[in-house]
Amino acid sequence: MSKRLVAYFSASGVTAKVAENLADAIGADIFEIQPEVPYTKADLNKKARSTIEMSDPASRPAIAAKRDNIDEYDTIFVGFPIWWYVAPIIINTFLESYNLKGKTIIPFATSGGSDMGKTNENLAPSCPGAKLLHGKVFNSYSSKADLSAWVETLSL
């Protein structure tokens, strides 16, 4: 079995819960993608920081710390909340911080009603040479069994 990492960004705690359950369910290591400048509730307003970042394709919010041993992982699950039908721009920052050539990247997201939208289309340029699989959206009630069953369908 390949070595797996679950890396996630969570603004409200929902994605963190799903990421922890996923890592537990599949025996993966876990890493929280933390912004250098944490998001506040006010930053998530449609007229605030998150919208400004999401409106600028060149924006790359800084990450507080990198995962030192990323080379050890063959498969990286990347979790995030859906913002405006795509991944938050900080996910692009994370992916672009490493050479992911030859790795399998699997996005997963949390949302109260959105699907993955154009997530893969927006993430693909940030992980050249990696195999980017189509992801899935989960809600806060997703169990370890649900997550494990999803991973089984990926035939990793």
Locations of regions flagged by a protein language model:
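N-terminal beta1-alpha1-beta2 submodule of the flavodoxin-like/Rossmannoid cofactor-binding fold
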Residues: 1-78, 85-87, 92-96, 145-156
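Glycine-centered flexibility sites
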Residues: 13, 79, 102, 112-117
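Short, conserved loop/helix-junction motifs that constitute active-site signature segments
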Residues: 96-102, 125-127
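Acidic catalytic loop of the alpha/beta-hydrolase fold
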Residues: 84-85, 113
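Redox-cofactor binding/interface segments in oxidoreductases and associated redox assembly factors
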Residues: 78-79, 107
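Short, glycine-/small-residue-rich phosphate/pyrophosphate-handling segment
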Residues: 106-143
